Regions:
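Metal-dependent phosphodiesterase/phospholipase catalytic core, i.e.
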Residues: 1-136, 140, 158-159, 165, ...
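C-terminal active-site rim and adjoining tail of enzyme catalytic domains
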Residues: 132-221
Length: 221
């Protein structure tokens, strides 16, 4: 819990306010940067607010113009839970439609990856990309489900571009098996240098990390 109410008082429970019931003006009035996050003690405490996806896209697009590399991409997670449909989030089809609407005008040279743990969301993403500019679909996998690769693929109903498990349950055998199926492997959430090195040795195609500065420094060694 790291948010602050408009009156300066801290938000004490994640159930205290349902932002799905607020308009954006109300959401923006909550600070989400000054209190800091206990999980990231080195993070600078800066006054901030939850931006719109469109604002993030505009910021990234402007930054890309000054970026020397042609390789540039967006990796967006659609956080979704079936028991939260119409409670704290839209139904999957509406959710996906709202996100794709914001992504529609992005330069086609920008690579887009859309990921989720929710199979319903992933299935809609897969069906909708036929009428949309191409993007990769990434299946985020809970640790307890990672040993059931084939049954999860069967449940999903299509071959995702990327398989994203928790890094702690990965093995060389699993990575090789997924590669044989033509599926990239990008585990989450790899924060320690030693674990980054291990994932590289396993043959992973990338990692998800809270510390890109560490990853960049490691790669440059």
């Amino acid at each position: 819990i790291f948010s602050t109410k408009p009156d300066g008082k801290p938000v004490l429970s994640d159930k205290e306010t349902n932002i799905y019931e607020l308009d954006y003006k109300e959401i923006r009035s909550y600070d989400v940067g000054l209190r800091g996050h206990s999980g990231f003690p080195d993070q600078n405490k800066v006054a901030s607010f939850k931006p719109l996806l469109s604002d993030v896209i505009d910021l990234i697009s402007a930054f890309r113009l000054s970026f020397s590399s042609k390789s540039f991409g967006l990796n967006i997670e659609l956080k979704s839970l079936p028991f939260e449909y119409n409670v704290s989030q839209p139904e999957p089809f509406e959710f996906v439609s709202l996100v794709l609407k914001e992504l529609y005008l992005i330069d086609s040279q920008v690579n887009i990856v859309l990921q989720s743990f929710d199979v319903n969301v992933l299935q809609i993403l897969h069906s909708e990309r036929q009428a949309f500019r191409y993007f990769d679909v990434s299946f985020l996998v809970e640790p307890e489900d990672d040993n059931e690769i084939d049954s999860n693929l069967e449940k999903l109903g299509f071959k995702p571009d990327i398989w994203s498990p928790n890094f702690s349950v990965l093995s060389k055998t699993k990575v090789d098996y997924l590669h044989q199926k033509g599926i990239k492997v990008i585990p989450w959430t790899v924060n320690e240098i030693s674990d980054m090195s291990q994932m590289l040795n396993l043959g992973c195609d990338g990692i998800i990390t809270d510390y890109p500065d560490r990853a960049i420094a490691y790669i440059k060694k």
